[in-house]
Each structure stands twice: as C-alpha cells, then as structure tokens.
C-alpha cells in the first residue's frame, strides 16, 4: 500500500466518523438559527420606537402687519394781510402811510394817484351836506380806493367839533369831555363818547382822532379846554372807557398827544419845549396813555413838542428815541402817527418834504399831512434811494393794514 492509499483510507475514515456529528450539527444549527431569528424579532418588537418632534404647518397666509399711521400735517393758513402786502407796488405801500387832509375838488383823483391810506375830514367837508349826501360822498371815496380807506375826523366835543357844529347832523355841538365830566362824572362823559361813536358809524366814518389823554391844569394853556380836567387816574379811566366803547363800535381810537402836552404852547404856531423830567412824566402824563394802550387802542398820535427828558433836540414826532420809548417801554405795537406835518413847529425847521422823510425814519407808520403830494414824492424817493429802509416800510404798512382789518375794512 502506498502512501497515497494510506492517506485516502484515513480521509475516508474521518469523513465517515464525522457524518453523525455533521448530521447532528446541521439539525442543531437550523434550530439555533430559528432561535436567533425569533430572538431578533422579539428584540425588535420590544425596542422603543423613536418618534420625531411634531412640525408646525407652514402658514400659507401672511401675518397681517398693522397699517402705518400717519400724523396729519397741520398747515398754517395764509395770512390775507400778508398776501395783500406782497401784491402791492412800492408806490401803493408808500401811499398807505398817508392820512391826508381831504381836498374835495381833487379827492377822487388823488386817491388813485397817491394810493392814499386815508383822509382826515374837517368842517368844510360837512358844510352843506346832509347825512345821506355825506354817506354817498364817502362811499365814492371808498369805491375809488384800491384798498379801503381810513376816514378820520376830530370830533372831540367842545372847541373841536367838525360834524356836530352843523344842525344837519346834530341839534347842538357835543360838549367837551371836561364839560361832560363836570355835568355827570365819568358816566356822563362816556355816554357822550358813545353818542359820538354812533354818529360816526352811521355816516361811514371809521376813525375818531381821540380820546385826548393830556393833563392840563393851567386855564391859559393851549390844551386846557380839550383835556378832561382831572388827575391822571381819572383821566386814565376816561381814556380806557372811551377806547373800549370805540372798539365796540369799530371806530378807530387814537390816543393823543403823546407823550403828554401838559401846559405847553401851541405847536401850530411855533416850537414848544417840555423840560419836565421823565419821572414827572411817568408819574402823571404818561399814565392815561398806558391805560389806553392796555384797553386796546388802535393808534397813538405823537406831538411836535420837544420833550427833553427823551430827546433834547428833536420834536417828539420826529424823534427815534420817543418812538423807541413808546414801543419798548410802553409796549405799544399798533399804529404810530404824527400830528399834522404842516404845523409851523415842523415846517419852519425842516421843510415839508424832509419832515415827512424824517417822520418815517423816526418810526411813524402814518403821516397826517396837508401837503401830501410833495411829501408822498419825498418819501417815495427816500425809499428808492435807500434812505428809508424797505423792511421798515413794510412793517409800517403791515400795521396800517392790520388796523384796517380790525375796523372791518379788510
């Protein structure tokens, strides 16, 4: 037997010997496999099941955003007076500075040529008229004016009566404030002023050059008969009461003659110098003006007196210092006007045209003028060549227009 035969026999024996084991092994392996499968399935069933976090549904519509709120913009309505001023020519603006003495023969032409701010009516303008004819005349003046006019008069009563001296308008002259007060105190004096307001209103006159604020104790003084004849306190009560009455009737009030005439001479015929101290003026003469300003007066008329406490050289009407005192110290923001610029206290020293220029430069808004043709040309030239500040001109015209507005003219 060869080596290879021997090996073959040994291999056969091993195989035969292993068969029972393999048979057992095969059965066992099947069972083991089945057991593993069952264990695996059981383990899978017992294992916890992972659950994912719930997801919110994606919104399909946009979340509404609150509408943006807008704050309403408040706009200041345009000022009709400013619009009127802006529309005016330089010539028209200069003309508004003039309260001219009415010349009946050329009145309609002059209103349009010089663009006059107003007329002052004197006795001759009422002579031969009736209330109806006068109303018609004054309506004609207003119709001719591009801008409604101030129609003013001196109806103080007593020695200064432009209207009531004529029976067509009143059976007898109005008494002076002094006479009315002496007859019935403040009540009677104010009743007299109210009747004056009613008469002026009925005729179409919108300004009375009063009340007189002056205090005069000297029976020989120029202003004595025209003053109330009382102390500063009583005069102040009369002035304030008169201003309130005039405002109620829409009659323009004009406090005169700032800063107080006192016992001084008549400036119609020459220069008057007041040498009193400022303390003396402030403790007496200026008090009625303060009362009138507080009551709401429309205008203040400045005298031609040289008041040395405020300006040692210039008449008050032409003095920047006097006007500054009236504005800054007295607190007056209305119309400031001159007494008539043809009075000799002015013309003898300055001439007609130059006086008007100086009056505007001093701070007057309104010039009482008889020679308005010459003075209008002088003021216009001074504006054009820069001697009169254009902004100052506009400020004066604005004050005049605002006064007209307060009187129901604009």
Explain the meaning of each model-derived region.
Residues 29-49:
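Sec-dependent N-terminal signal peptides of Gram-positive bacterial secreted proteins and lipoproteins
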Residues 17-28:
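Short, Lys/Arg-enriched N-terminal segments with co-localized hydrophobic residues
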Residues 112-235, 257, 262-275, 303-318, ...:
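Enzymes and membrane/adaptor proteins characterized by extended Gly/Ser/Thr/Asp/Glu-rich
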Residues 385-410:
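Mid-to-C-terminal alpha-helical segments outside catalytic/metal-binding sites
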Residues 95-96, 117, 146-149, 205-206, ...:
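Short, well-ordered coil/turn segments that N-cap beta-strands
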Residues 141-147, 230-251, 316-337:
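Alpha-helix-loop-beta-strand connector modules within alpha/beta enzyme cores
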Residues 45-48, 53-151, 155-165:
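N-terminal hydrophobic targeting/anchoring segments and the immediately downstream early-domain regions
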């Amino acid at each position: 037997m060869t080596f290879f035969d021997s090996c073959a026999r040994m291999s056969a024996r091993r195989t035969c010997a292993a068969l029972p084991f393999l048979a057992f092994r095969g059965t066992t392996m099947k069972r083991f496999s089945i057991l593993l499968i069952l264990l695996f399935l059981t383990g899978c069933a017992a294992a916890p099941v992972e659950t994912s976090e719930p997801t919110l549904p994606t919104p399909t519509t946009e979340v509404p955003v609150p509408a943006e709120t807008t704050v309403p913009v408040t706009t200041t309505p345009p000022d009709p007076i400013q619009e009127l001023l802006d529309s005016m020519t330089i010539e028209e603006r200069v003309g508004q500075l003039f309260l001219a003495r009415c010349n009946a023969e050329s009145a309609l032409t002059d209103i349009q040529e010089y663009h006059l701010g107003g007329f002052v009516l004197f006795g001759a303008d009422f002579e031969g008229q009736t209330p109806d004819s006068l109303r018609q005349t004054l309506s004609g003046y207003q119709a001719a004016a591009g801008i409604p006019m101030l129609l003013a008069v001196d109806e103080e009563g007593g020695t200064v009566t432009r209207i009531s001296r004529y029976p067509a308008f009143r059976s007898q002259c109005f008494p002076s404030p002094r006479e009315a007060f002496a007859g019935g105190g403040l009540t009677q004096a104010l009743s007299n002023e109210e009747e004056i307001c009613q008469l002026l209103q009925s005729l179409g006159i919108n300004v009375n050059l009063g009340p007189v604020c002056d205090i005069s104790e000297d029976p020989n003084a120029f202003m004595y008969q025209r003053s109330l004849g009382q102390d500063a306190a009583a005069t102040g009560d009369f002035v304030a009461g008169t201003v309130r009455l005039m405002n109620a009737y829409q009659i323009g009030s004009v406090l005169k003659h700032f800063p107080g005439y006192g016992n001084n001479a008549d400036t119609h015929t020459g220069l008057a110098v007041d040498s009193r101290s400022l303390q003396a003026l402030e403790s007496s003469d200026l008090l009625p003006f303060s009362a009138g300003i507080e009551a709401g007066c429309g205008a203040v008329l400045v005298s031609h007196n040289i008041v040395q406490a405020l300006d040692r050289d210039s008449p008050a009407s032409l003095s920047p210092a006097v006007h500054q005192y009236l504005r800054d110290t007295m607190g007056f923001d209305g119309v400031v006007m001159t007494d008539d610029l043809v009075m000799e206290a002015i013309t003898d020293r300055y001439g007609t045209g130059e006086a008007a220029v100086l009056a505007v430069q001093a701070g007057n808004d309104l010039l009482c003028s008889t020679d308005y043709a010459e003075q209008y040309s002088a003021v216009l030239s001074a504006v054009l060549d820069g001697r009169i500040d254009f902004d100052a001109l506009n400020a004066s015209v604005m004050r005049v227009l605002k006064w007209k507005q307060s009187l129901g003219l604009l």
